[in-house]
Amino acid sequence: MKLFDEIPAERPATPLLDTCEHPAALHDFNATQLRQLADELRAYLLYSVGCTGGHFGAGLGVVELTVALHHILDTPYDRLVWDVGHQAYPHKILTGRREQMSTIRQFGGLAAFPKRDESPYDTFGVGHSSTSISAALGMALAARTKGERRRVCAVIGDGALSAGMAFEALAHAGHVDANMLVILNDNEMSISENVGGMASYLARILVSKPYTVMRENSKRVLSHLPGALELARRTEEHVKGMVSPATLFEEMGFNYIGPIDGHDLPTLVQTLGNMANLEGPQFLHIKTCKGRGFRPAEADPIGYHAITKLEKTTSEPPPKKEPRSPNAATAEPEAQPKPQPKPRKYCNVFGEWICDMAAVDARLIGITPAMREGSDLIRFSREYPERYYDVAIAEQHAVTLAAGMACEAMKPVVAIYSTFLQRGYDQLIHDVAVQALDVTFAIDRAGVVGEDGPTHHGALDLSFLRCIPGMIVLAPADEAECRAMLSAAYHHPGPAAVRYPRGTGPGTQVASNLEALPIGEAETRRSGREGGVALLAFGSMNGPAGEVAERLDATHLNMRSVKPLDREAILAAARDHRLLVTLEESVVAGGAGSGVNELLAAEGVQVEVLNLGLPDDFVEHGKPAELLAACGLDAEGIETAVRRRLETSRADD
C-alpha cells in the first residue's frame, strides 16, 4: 500500500483506474491488479477531495473494501447499501462518476452521499446514520418474495451501529433468516469518538481481566503436559468465540466472521467471495483505519473527517509569520488600521454560553447525540465532565434522557442538529412536551446547510416545532440575540428551542452577561412608509430583509419569536400597511408565516400577506448563498417577489 504525506498537487497517473468505467471491469482482475487499482483509487481520491473539499477520512479507510466488494458482487443487480454515505466516494469513482468528482457537493453537481436518482449503483439514498441494515433487509425480503437470487450487502460503521434502529434490523434479519451480508466497518470512530456499551464491548472483551487471567493460568498448567500447550494455542480461537463479538451477533441469528484486517485486500477478497454465496444472515467484522494511506489523517481522524479545498496540505506546520521590520516598531498607532472583529460561528456562541451558564447553575446538564465537535461542546465536556453526556448516535434516547433529568429538577440542554432532531420527534412530543418538562433545545444547522444537501438541511423544524402545544420557539437574527435567546429558553419553565443557522453570524458584538431576551416581543428595525410594505423577518432572514426594506422604504420587523408570536406587533403592522411579507429560512407550509396567517384570521383582520420561505420540495446541495438565491430568498429574490405582488395588487384595485 502506498502511503502519502501530502495531497497530490497534480492529478496522479491512474492507468488501471482509467479503464474502469463500470464495476464489471473489476470482475476479472487478479490480485496484483486489484492492489494496483486500490493504490490508484486512493491517490485519485486524495487529489479529487483536495480539489473540491468534502468527506475525507472515511473514504480513505474503505478503499480496499470498495474494490473487493465491486470485484465480488455483480452490482447493480446485487444490492450494495452504504450507511450514512461518508465513505461512498470510492464507490462513486468506481461506478462511472470519476470525471464528475470535480463537481461533488456543488450546486448542480454530484451529491455528497449515495442518491438513487444519481446512479443505479446507489441503491438507497442516505445521509443520516443507521438505516442501511433495515433497507438492505427490505431488499433481501423483496428478492425472496419475487424469487430473485440477488445478493444484498449493507456496510455500516461502528458509530452507526450504536443506534437502536440498527439492532432492531439485525434482530429482524436473524428472525426471518434473510439472505444478506452485513459488514461492520470498525474504525473505532464515528464523527466524534465512539461512546456507549457497544463500542466498549467490541474494544474490551478480548482484553478483559477474566479472559486474560484464564488464559495465563491455563498456559501455566498446560506447560507441564506434553503437547498440551500447542493444543491450547490451536483451540484459543474457539475459546475466543465463546466471549467475543460473535456471541452477540450469533445470538441474533447471524453467522459471524472476524474481525479481519480491512486493508488486507487478498484476505478481504477471499472472505467476501466465500460469504457472499452463503445462505442466511452473514456478518463480517472488519477492522480499518480512518484516513488510511494519508498519514496526517491517520494521526487526526476527527480533524480529517472532512476538509475544505483550501486544505491541500500536508503534515508540515503552518508557515511562520515574517518578523516585523525595525521601522514598524516606530510607526504611530493611529497609522495602523483597526482590526475588525471576525464574525463568530453560532455554534461557538452556544459553546461559550453553555459554559458560562453552567458556572452559575449547577443544575445544568449538557447532552448531545455524537456531535461534541460540531455543536462546540468540547470546552464544556472538559470543564464539566460529570455534567456532560454524549449518548452516541441515539437521538431518541438523548431527548428522553433529558426528560428524565428534568423530572428530577435538573436543567438539561440538548445540543442537536435540526435534521437529527427529526429522529427524536416522538420523544420530544410524548416525553417532553406532554409533561411540560423543562428542557432546552439548542438546534444548530437550521435552514439550508449547504453541500450535504437535502438529508442535512434544517428546513422543517419551524413547522414541526410550532405545532407542539406549549413549545417555545425562538430564532435569532444575530450572535447577540442567539446568546440572549439561549438564556431566555433556559429560564423558561417548560420546553423551549432556539434554532440557529450553520456558520457565522453578521458580526454583532456579543455581551458577556447572561441576560435573557423577552420572549414574544418583536423588534422594529426600520419604520417605513405608512400604507406600504412591512417585512416580518424571522431569524437569518433579517439580513436580506434589511437590504430590501431600504430599497422599498418598507418597515422591517425582526420577529425574534416564532412561538409565541408578537400579537400586538403583527396587528399594528396589518393596520398600518397594505402588504405584509413574512420571511423565513424554513418551509412555508406550517411555518412562521403560517402562524402569522392564523393569527390574522383568528383576529378577523383582512390584509394582504405574502409568505416567502423554502419551497415545498427538498432543496438540493450547493453553497448556502447559491441555494437561497435559487429559492428566491436573497435580497434580489425577495425584492422581485414583493414588487411583483405589489404590481398584481394594483392591477386588481
From Swiss-Prot:
Thiamine diphosphate binds at residues 86, 127-129, 159-160, 187, 294, 395. One of its GO terms (molecular function) is magnesium ion binding. Pathway: Metabolic intermediate biosynthesis; 1-deoxy-D-xylulose 5-phosphate biosynthesis; 1-deoxy-D-xylulose 5-phosphate from D-glyceraldehyde 3-phosphate and pyruvate: step 1/1. Pfam families: DXP_synthase_N (PF13292), Transket_pyr (PF02779), Transketolase_C (PF02780). GO terms for biological process: 1-deoxy-D-xylulose 5-phosphate biosynthetic process; isopentenyl diphosphate biosynthetic process, methylerythritol 4-phosphate pathway; terpenoid biosynthetic process; thiamine biosynthetic process. Its cofactor is Mg(2+); thiamine diphosphate. Keywords: Isoprene biosynthesis, Magnesium, Metal-binding, Thiamine biosynthesis, Thiamine pyrophosphate, Transferase. Its EC number is 2.2.1.7. Transmembrane segments: none annotated. Residues 309-324 have a biased composition (Basic and acidic residues). Binds 1 Mg(2+) ion per subunit. Binds 1 thiamine pyrophosphate per subunit. One of its GO terms (cellular component) is cytosol. Mg(2+) binds at residues 158, 187. It catalyses: D-glyceraldehyde 3-phosphate + pyruvate + H(+) = 1-deoxy-D-xylulose 5-phosphate + CO2. Residues 309-343 are annotated as: Disordered. It is an enzyme of class 2 (transferase). Homodimer. Catalyzes the acyloin condensation reaction between C atoms 2 and 3 of pyruvate and glyceraldehyde 3-phosphate to yield 1-deoxy-D-xylulose-5-phosphate (DXP). Belongs to the transketolase family. DXPS subfamily. This is 1-deoxy-D-xylulose-5-phosphate synthase. It comes from Chromohalobacter salexigens (strain ATCC BAA-138 / DSM 3043 / CIP 106854 / NCIMB 13768 / 1H11). The gene is dxs.
